[in-house]
Every structure is written in C-alpha cells, then in structure tokens.
C-alpha cells in the first residue's frame, strides 16, 4: 500500500524532451477582442440606453407643445455576474519524491505549463458561450445503447471530460468521456468516472440532443446568438431586462441564411453586409464565422477570377490574409464603405454568421480570470484522504457580457452546413 501519485515511476526517468501533447489553440477570440472592465464587484449592473431620440420636425410652423416627441431613456440591468470555476488537482506524493524541488529533467517541470494550458481551455469554454451559446456540440446521429454518440464538434471533447447531455424533451444527465474516435466523430460515454459505457440511446437528433459543459444547461454567459436573434428566430425575447421588440435599439438585424451555399457565398455575404449597413448604426466591420463558412469564402475569392489582389468583383485589401497563432484567421476585403474583415474562429458554429461592431459589447468582471486564494494567501486547497494529500487549484471568472449597442450588429441564422459540403 502507498499514497497516490500521478507520475509514478516516471519521476526518476530521464526526460530530454518537452511533454508531447496536442496543440491547444487559443479559442478565445470573443474574450480577446471585446472591450473589458474588470472593476465590477457584483450586485445589479445598470445598463441605461437611449431608446428613442427627439424627432419633432415640422415644415412652415412650430410643432405644438403637446405634440413634441421627447428623448426616451430606458433603464436596463444585469442582476448579477455569472460564475465559472475551473479546478485542477495534484498529488502531494509527486512533490515529496523530489523533496519539494522540481528538477529540470523531471516530469514535474510540466506543471506550470499544465496550469496555463488549463486556463486556455477555460477561456475556450467561456468564449463558446459568449459567442454561440451554452451548448458546445450536438448529436448528428442518435446515441446508442453502447454509449456512443456521433457529434458535430469532436475537437471540443477530451478524455475524462464531464459532459451534460440534454434534449428538447429528454432530461439532462451527466456522463464522462471514456473514448474518442477523431475520424468517426464518435465519443463514448460512461455514467461514472472511469466506468463502463452507458446507454445514451435516449439522446436523439430529432430531440436536438446537445452537449453542455457541467451545469451550463442551467446557467451560462450571455451569448451573441441569444442577444442578437429575435425570439421568433431562436433568441430571447428580452435583453438586460427589457423587451427587444419594444425598442429598435435592442434589435440586431436578422437575416435568414437557409439559402446561403458555397456557390453564392460571396454575393450573400455582401448582400447581408449591405442590409446591416442600411438598418444598423455603428460600424459592423467584422464578420464572425466558423471554418466551414470561412473556407467557402476563401475558395470563392480565389476562384472568382483575376490575379494578384484583384479577384473578379472582390478586391482583397493590401492587408491581405492573416493567420494567427491565437487560433483564428482573417481576410480583409475592400468595400464601398471601407474594409470588412472576415474572421474565422474555432469556437464558432456553422449555422450562424455575425456582422459585428467590436465597440458594441463590454465584458464586465471582478478581476477577470484569477486563482482562488485563501485568507493566508495560498492559491491551493489541501485535501487529506487515506491515499495521501492532494492540492486543488481553483480558477474563477466572475462576470457577464454587456451588450451596450446590440442594434449596431447583424446576424445570419439558419445556415445549413450541408450547403457547404
């Protein structure tokens, strides 16, 4: 018998190479590129906005005093911030075997990188919610009695991950990932951590079975999808406590995308941009999309004829194309109103495209991401069991996205990924 340790005999083995691991892209475009305020200490946050401006103009005579329209001011609010907690655990035995010191040729030298990798993962989870909503994947084939579900976003699953499955009628239940087949887009689930495959046949495509981060089906951050779509098109009826249909200020331009295909993508893209420019205020200069739609856009530009930066009727800006180490790609096109930048991001879904004004939203938080500290200043919590001591490190994010100018944006909804195959 002995106390638990993670690295076991590897502690005393020679490690000339850095840890081999999957490339973890920074899938946090929304968090990285919105305005931020980290001074919110909780409580109700007031979101005041001018719902209507004075509009009384009369030709030839003065407007009667009783007939003058006034500025209309509305008081919206966010009741409190959302909480996201990320947790990691380490075994004390791993440190004891090296007398508390981490030598260079030891597997323990990966610990600092592991903490940073986990923070990147946590940012991805939050950024998905801020962009496209609380669920991160959907079933594309009905679940099986053998625990297998075919999903649309296999890249968002990891071994031992806790996942909540929920359908329109099927109640939510928690499962753990025990196997992943990248090529088949299949994930196998157990009802217990480390257990055998569980029956997940109740979760079907017809019932819109979706995968959520633990408890995200109950509480999640305000998403662009929900904020910009009208209730008729799948969004919420209210935003920051006020009814969207009561005020044009709260209404983003909604554009149906069912007719968007890989063959007409550029025409549809600019038709949508024109529609947003006609109806919206501000400058929606960013087009946010996933790589399915973004890839079709790039192919269409390359295949539209011409040479150099001139591609048929579409002119690539001198900024050209820009691939980012942070996990997104951009291509900038010239328009009659300046430039428009198409941003392809990993944490986006293929059924929506957003024409985004970067100045229209602010993420307000209490210190952004930070490790939990106890009153003694320690950034870990000590746990004692019969198997030894363990240290738990918790990272928290208290905050919420405030959409200060939703009417400046546009959203294309109902895009069919099958149209881009």
Locate the predicted segments by residue.
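Core alpha/beta structural scaffold of self-assembling particle/tube/pore-forming proteins
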Residues: 1-58, 72-421
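N-terminal amphipathic/basic membrane-interacting segments and domains
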Residues: 57, 64-68
């Amino acid at each position: 018998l002995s106390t638990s340790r993670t690295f076991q005999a590897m502690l005393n083995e020679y490690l000339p190479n850095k840890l081999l691991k999957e490339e973890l892209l920074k899938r946090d475009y929304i968090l990285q590129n919105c305005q931020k305020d980290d001074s919110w200490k909780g409580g109700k946050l007031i979101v005041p906005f001018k719902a209507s401006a004075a509009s009384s103009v009369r030709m030839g005579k003065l407007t009667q005093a009783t007939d003058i329209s006034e500025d209309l001011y509305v008081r919206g609010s966010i009741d409190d911030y959302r909480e996201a907690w990320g947790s990691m655990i380490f075994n004390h035995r791993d440190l004891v075997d090296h007398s508390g010191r981490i030598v260079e040729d030891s597997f323990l030298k990966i610990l600092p990188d592991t903490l940073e990798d986990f923070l990147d993962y946590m940012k991805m989870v939050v950024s998905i919610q801020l962009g496209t909503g609380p669920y991160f994947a959907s079933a594309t084939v009905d679940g099986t009695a053998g625990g297998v579900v075919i999903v649309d976003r296999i890249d968002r699953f990891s071994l031992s991950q806790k996942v909540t499955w929920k359908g329109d009628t099927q109640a939510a239940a928690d499962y753990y990932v025990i196997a992943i087949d990248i090529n088949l887009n299949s994930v196998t689930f157990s009802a217990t951590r480390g257990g055998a495959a569980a029956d997940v046949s109740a979760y079907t495509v017809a019932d819109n079975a979706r995968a959520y981060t633990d408890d995200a089906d109950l509480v999640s951050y305000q998403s662009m999808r929900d904020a910009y779509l009208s209730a008729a098109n799948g969004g919420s009826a209210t935003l920051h406590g006020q009814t969207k249909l009561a005020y044009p200020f709260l209404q983003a331009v909604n554009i149906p995308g069912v007719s968007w295909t890989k063959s007409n993508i550029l025409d549809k893209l600019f038709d949508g941009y024109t529609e947003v420019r006609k109806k919206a205020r501000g400058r929606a200069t960013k087009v946010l999309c996933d790589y399915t739609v973004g890839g079709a856009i790039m192919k269409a530009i390359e295949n539209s004829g011409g040479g150099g930066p001139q591609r048929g009727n579409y002119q690539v800006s001198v900024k050209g194309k820009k691939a980012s180490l942070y996990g997104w790609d951009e291509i900038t096109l010239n328009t009659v109103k300046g430039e428009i930048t198409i941003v392809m991001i990993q944490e986006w879904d293929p059924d929506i495209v957003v024409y985004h004004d970067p100045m229209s939203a602010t993420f307000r938080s209490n210190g952004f991401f930070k490790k939990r500290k106890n009153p003694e200043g320690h950034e870990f919590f000590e746990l004692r069991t019969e198997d030894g001591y363990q240290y738990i490190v918790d990272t928290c994010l208290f905050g919420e996205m405030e959409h200060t100018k939703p009417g400046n944006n546009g959203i294309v909804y109902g895009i069919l990924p099958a149209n881009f195959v």
